[in-house]
Amino acid sequence: MITDAFDNSEVLFGTKDFYGEQKHLCDNCMIIFSEKIFEYMLDTYEHQEVGAIRCCNGITPVYVFDIEGMKIAGYLSHIGSALAGGDVIDVNWLTGAVKFIMFGSAGSLDSGLTTGKFVIPTHSYREEGLSYHYAPPADYIEVKNAKTVKAIFDELKLPNVLGKVWTTDAIYRETKAKFDARKKEGCIAVEMELAGVQAVCDFYGWELYNFLVTGDVLDQAVYDVSGLADANHNMDKLYVAIEIAKRI
């Protein structure tokens, strides 16, 4: 079973086999999911391409940006827990980054709590596969830096809500029964990367700082996707991530 997948024995190969010696260029990295935000970063900030995540279906360039005097790595992440978690491992090797700021959109399970607020996850339900290779089995994984992120949002006087979230691999299998079960357990949003990326960071001793903006709404009589584009691409998330980078 997938829940038996955690095995801390020696690996057969690793990042060095694909990329050579590790680079040490910066400590902080932004995990970007929005193509529009990433294009804005490339247009706005001085940057240098320092490597690339390479696979048979394409190349993902990795950059180090100069943002307000800080050296911050950044790249356009693949979607989904397994791919996003693999990207983090590769980018650590290519840049030396050990502090990852990840932000993106989510679906709201409780619009009364999330509307008009940033969501700061405290735990994530592990309905994906990657986390079980990097952490012992459990229903939830703790998002360890939630209190740190919360303190930064409060300092910046940004509206926010703490809560559990649900990480799924199956975007078209968010069913009514699962919705009800997760909401009963206290989940307020659903997304596709956090549990796996948090497990990877915990395994290697790296830090993850995550926040979300809800776009589509699942707790209404009719599924509402009207806010998703803004949740994906609004630049306010980038500016918040920069403020987090200043403080970690």
Describe every region a protein language model picked out:
Residues 1-143, 147-148, 203:
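Metabolite-binding pocket within alpha/beta catalytic cores that recognizes anionic/polar moieties
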Residues 218-248:
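His/Asp/Glu-rich mid-to-C-terminal helical/loop segments that flank catalytic regions of hydrolases
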Residues 139-184:
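Active-site rim beta-loop-alpha module in soluble metabolic enzymes
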Residues 195-230:
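Zn-dependent metallopeptidase/amidohydrolase metal-coordination segment
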Residues 148-156, 200, 240-248:
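Generic non-transmembrane alpha-helical segments
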Residues 187-189:
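Short pre-catalytic strand/loop immediately N-terminal to key active-site residues, enriched for Gly-Thr
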Residues 50-54, 158-163, 248:
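Flexible, glycine/charged-enriched surface loops at secondary-structure junctions
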